[in-house]
Curated annotation (Swiss-Prot):
The gene is gatB. This is Aspartyl/glutamyl-tRNA(Asn/Gln) amidotransferase subunit B. Belongs to the GatB/GatE family. GatB subfamily. It comes from Oceanobacillus iheyensis (strain DSM 14371 / CIP 107618 / JCM 11309 / KCTC 3954 / HTE831). HAMAP family: GatB. Transmembrane segments: none annotated. It holds the Pfam family GatB_N.
Amino acid sequence: MNFETIIGLEVHVELKTNSKIFSPSTNEFGSDPNTNVNPIDLGYPGTLPVLNEEAVNFAMKAAMALNCEIATDTKFDRKNYFYPDNPKAYQISQFDQPIGENGWIEIEVNGEKKKIGITRLHLEEDAGKLTHGEDGYSYVDFNRQGTPLIEIVSEPDMRSPEEAYAYLEKLKNIIQYTGVSDVKMQEGSLRCDANISLRPIGQEEFGTKAELKNLNSFSYVQKGLEFEEKRQEKELLSGGEILQETRRYDEKTKETILMRVKEGSDDYRYFPEPDLVPLYIDEEWKERVRSEIPELPDARLERYINELGLSEYDANVLTASKQMSDFFEEATAEGADMKQVSNWLMGEVSAYMNKHYKELDELAITPEALAKMINLIEDGTISSKIAKKVFAELVENGGDPQKIVEEKGLVQISDPAQLKQIVNEVLDQNEQSIIDFKNGKNKAKGFLVGQIMKATKGQANPPLVNKILAEELNNR
């Protein structure tokens, strides 16, 4: 029997508002434990939540970017559960009237495009962070308590772990472009739970799903789903039953492990939040937020191809990261050739980032500096080979490319008379290579070019070297 895989994802995104969703506490990552905490966050008696308008605007902006319908009437609800990182014993969330519904995004896998539906996008508050120490104690940091979150729930439209990976990449990219979140998984500002079930091919009814947690990277999402796909298939083929349960992905064993039997929404005893009035979002408010949405990745991709004339490959690579795309825009605005900027970003810059595990905004090089360096290549001041030395300095320490070239004596030798003298000195020292070249051995010319570059420490103008060398060889 063959099975069809059904996957849906629930993605939590922390919004980078200045303050928390219901209190004036600072919303900042990386502070000392329990320093960004307020009595409202902890649910002290007598405290009342006040809704952060910026969080609502950010949620609407994200929902609009994901093609959602924006609610006119919405409200907040209490989700009741007890856990040490939840001091109020309830979470303020949205149950039956989310801020956004019926959205979609388009993904591409193996050259095939596909729309993935988004069921809903709702606002809620985050819980604290629980850390289990090796000393047998558990420690809780309430800095994250009350951080504004949006939860984005997809339709069960994905049919493979590869599609789930592509969906996450596209979703992250869109949210990043809106500017409402940093969407950094390593900092917890993007978290993902996955639901997966199998059904016999041709059957319309869904199978029993399992929920996967502890998915700390996009690759773990894919690996966890791949394992769970095989586990469920094996269980079904042996006549077993799939239970509705929550499982976690173990990075060491590369397996999913049972955590608990899955709760249903009834277990949370949702009811309307009594301390917050319902929210009315009129058309004027919606249009004001819509006007603030910047150019999104698909629109930028189309512009790069149709207006700038970039290849589809280059445009896809550049727009896959807002940081990379913004860097490209700023560098070309400084007058650098766009193809050269694209080549450097996809080549040397990306290679450095991958080698050192750094983001683009962590590098010392600026768009202005890269543009100046490219212009130095274009006007013949430095060669492409010398440029790599300049780049190495810029990416580590920053600075002005012109000054680096002057201080390190890296200016390209382009004086014909000076180069002619060096070429003849090299020829005088390598008479056998001249004979070999005259006898049709073209490798001899390559050897001579190498000797000239060595004599000039790589600073000779390559096209000019080739021209003068050809002339002098003919004269011998």
